[in-house]
């Protein structure tokens, strides 16, 4: 059974860690809403609140749980 709210996945263009996390979530059948900070710079402030100022992706927000750069990350 899929959760009602999609998982938020913050990424940037050209980030191999982001691509790996996207593929992992897709393989698990998880509904994902991807937010690319390269294409949407207006969301950077929102992301920095989530990461407490760390400029790194990928960031996964699932319910109340936040994973910052699981398995490695790229700065932006």
Report the location of each language-model feature:
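Local sequence-structure signature of Cys/Sec-based thiol-disulfide redox active-site neighborhoods
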Residues: 1-33
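Non-catalytic, surface beta->alpha helical segment in thiol-disulfide oxidoreductase systems
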Residues: 61-76
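Residue-level recognition of specific faces of alpha-helices
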Residues: 17, 43-46, 59
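Solvent-exposed, flexible loop/coil residues
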Residues: 21, 41, 61
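Structural micro-motif
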Residues: 51-63
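Residues that form or flank phosphate/diphosphate-binding pockets in enzymes
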Residues: 19, 42, 70
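Glycine-/small-residue-rich active-site loops that bind phosphorylated ligands and cofactors
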Residues: 16, 39, 67
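Thioredoxin-like thiol-disulfide oxidoreductase module
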Residues: 36-54
């Amino acid at each position: 059974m899929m959760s009602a709210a999609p998982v938020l996945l913050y990424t940037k263009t050209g980030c191999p860690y982001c691509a790996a996390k996207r593929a992992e979530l897709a393989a698990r059948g998880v509904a994902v809403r991807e937010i690319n900070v390269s294409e949407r710079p207006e969301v950077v402030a929102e992301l920095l609140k989530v990461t407490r100022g760390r400029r790194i992706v990928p960031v996964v927000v699932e319910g109340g749980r936040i994973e910052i750069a699981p398995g490695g990350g790229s700065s932006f």
